[in-house]
Structure formats: C-alpha cells, structure tokens
Amino acid sequence: MRLNELNREELSALYRSQMTRDFPPQELKPLKSMLELMEEGRYQALGLFDEEELLGYALVWREPGVPFALLDYLGTLPGVRNRGLGGQMLDLLADYYREERGIFGEAESDEGGDPTDRELRHRRLGFYLRNGFRYGGYDCALFGVHYQALIRGTADVSPEELLEVHRRFYQSRFPAHIYERFVQLPLAPGETPNPPGNWMEE
C-alpha cells in the first residue's frame, strides 16, 4: 500500500461522495476552504492505495516554515473498514512526514457533547492513542466542538510549543473576529465551548 497525492478534482469527488457521509456537518470544513488552502500550497489530500484501488484518505494542513503537519481528516472507504487500515495509514503518514517534528491533530473529546455519541468519541480517541499519538497537553474548542489535541512526533515537543504551533495554523487562516469568536486555543478546564458557528462565516 502507498500514499498518493490527490488533485483538486479528486479531492472534490472524495468530499462529495465520502466525507459528507463520514463526518457530521459541524466538523467538516467547506470544500471551498480546502481547495483555497490547496491552491496556496498549504493543504495536501493523500489517498491510501492498494495498486489502483483507493482505500482511504488523509487530509493534511501545512504552514510554510512550520515543521509540523496538522492531520485534518482521516477516513477509510465503506467496504474496507475494520481491517486495520487506519493504523497502517497513520504509520505511512509518519513516514511521509518523517522530516517534520510531528503530526498533530484534534480528536473530539469524550467529555460533554451528545451523550449518545460518547462511546464513538471514546473509541476514536483510543484509536489514535493506540497508534502512536499522545495527548498534547491541552484541550481546545473549534466552532463549538470540544477537542483534545493529540500529537505523534518527537518526545521533546512540549505542550507550550505545540499550542503555539496550533494557534499559528488557525490565526493564519481566519480573520481576527472569526478566530476570537470560534477558536478557543486552549480550552481551559471547566470552560465551555462557545456556541457553534457556520464554517462558511469565514
């Protein structure tokens, strides 16, 4: 298996056919936002292929001069799930970005939120923690959703360094009024996420 970069058309097709089914609306960036970042050279769509068959995908946000990669979305296609492909894809990503200090991301916290989804959130967190990620040292809230910061990288990455990098990604993308309203980095213990907003308000 290998990772191949997808182009704009392939990302657009993947978004419409799979991602809108795989992720709830409040967690999914607009396609327009992804394509703009890709046009700027700041977003990579990687497909997991077995020969010519697409099995999964990883969307990764990059910032110039920042030695970290933000894993924005990870998914496998229907029909090939529960085969360990997610863990294999994380290993391939770690090799793909081996020159960087780490890959980090956000996994929805199992605290708060809709109690009917709590078990799913708990399983997602466990998946990342079983596959080389560790807690980054802080929680955050993005557009009303409570996340935990996770990282797979060198052991010397401190929570302070990761938080600074994490802020840089979002501050570079959103105007100050959107950032202040919808991005809470970090989310202090006991603090409540701000009311959710529409990604399109950017």
What kind of feature is each model-predicted range?
Residues 1-33, 161, 165-168, 181, ...:
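Short amphipathic alpha-helix that is part of the acyltransferase structural core
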Residues 21-51, 59:
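Active-site rim helix/loop that mediates acceptor-substrate recognition in acyltransferases
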Residues 47, 53-62, 68-75:
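Conserved beta-strand in the GNAT
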Residues 62-71, 81, 99-101, 146:
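A conserved beta-turn-beta hairpin within the catalytic core of GNAT-like acetyltransferases
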Residues 74-81, 109-111:
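A short, internal acetyl-CoA/4′-phosphopantetheine-binding micro-motif in the GNAT/acyltransferase core
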Residues 76, 82-96, 120:
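Conserved acetyl-CoA-binding loop-helix of GNAT-fold acetyltransferases
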Residues 97-120:
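Conserved GNAT acetyl-CoA-binding A-motif
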Residues 120, 141-202:
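C-terminal "cap" of GNAT-fold acetyltransferases
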